Amino acid sequence: MPKNTLHIKNIDIQTTHIMLKTDINCDIKPFIQNQREIILNEIKENPNFLKSYTPIPLIDKKPILKLMTKAGEIANTGPMAAVAGSISEMCLDYLESFKSKFSIVENGGDIALKTNKKINMGIYAGKTSFSYNYGFKIKPKPYKYGICTSSYDGPSKSFGSTDATIVFSKQSSIADSLATSIGNYGNGNTENEVVHNALSYAEKYSDYYEGVLVIKGETLGKTGHIPQLISINNTHVKEAFEIE
């Protein structure tokens, strides 16, 4: 796919920071604003939607609230653990409604994508040597695919100490909540112990993901099937994505 056929946008709305690459030329910002308003209105009506660290009952059945609540139920987290991944997933669904064949939606590191080309993407794992030096080669995904990351020093609350807990799933909403849940169990006295504990806990959710990769310091471990790990030398890949 020639790069000039892609529409590349950065959309910032308060705490939502979207990087978009898509073959669809449309103004998606009003859609994102609407999803945010739905979430904020729910928080006003039900403050526990924001505060809970455990699953809560669904009251309003708007699609994005259903995604967040379901993801929380699966991963045993509160719905806000899935907020970034759910916004990404809703944006991808919106682009798919226009027959998109290539779309990448990144929301603060939580990614929903559908591609007809291989792409390379970098890993960010704090101050470890893996950050910006290694990444993944993602095969074409003609269906929805989610890649979400949680870390102890990220913008969202984590009770674990992993530098990166990366989950690959068919839904970015679920990948997001699972990254939080699995990352919460990444604790221990050594790097190996942190990685082992997170991956051991991940096994109970194996029906909901394709693979999980955990990084602590200079130690890396994985379970399930993850994309091919690659060394990255291209500066562009370190900052975003490279299309093959």
Swiss-Prot record:
Family statement drawn from the similarity comment of this UniProt entry: Belongs to the UPF0280 family.
InterPro entries: ApbE-like_sf, MA1715-like, UPF0280
Source organism (scientific name): Methanosphaera stadtmanae (strain ATCC 43021 / DSM 3091 / JCM 11832 / MCB-3)
Cited HAMAP family: UPF0280
Protein name as annotated: UPF0280 protein Msp_1322
SUPFAM superfamilies per the UniProt record, alphabetical: ApbE-like (SSF143631)
